[in-house]
């Protein structure tokens, strides 16, 4: 079977983003006089989108919908401007992606990171690599592991051969 399309997650798969997520979240927490967290704690906070990251980083008594939404807005604004201070591609990833493109494989990203952040990171770290679809978190689209974002990519790219693999 010839592989025609590969869909990748972004954070923790193509890019090591935890340093910027942690630094930016701590910046927002510090601005509000709230406790900061260790790198190791942030490793346990990430993986389900920005809303869950912020919720987990806040003290339990402040995890109201209003506070989480306000801190999320501050985080997104700050993170969008400081998204690439510590983030790096994992070793060998740019070369792998270039090799796949040379073999005629179409590439896509399906991320739980907010859409603008997803697009910005792909532009910064993979400027010479063509991605046929870059989908981040968007209103009305459930977060992964819900398959909707993958189905949207498959539909947009009119891909009909489906094989679900794991790395």
Regions found by a protein language model. Name each.
Residues 85-88, 114-167:
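Substrate-recognition "cap/lid" segment bordering the active-site pocket of phosphatases
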Residues 20, 49-52, 95, 116-117:
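Short alpha-helical
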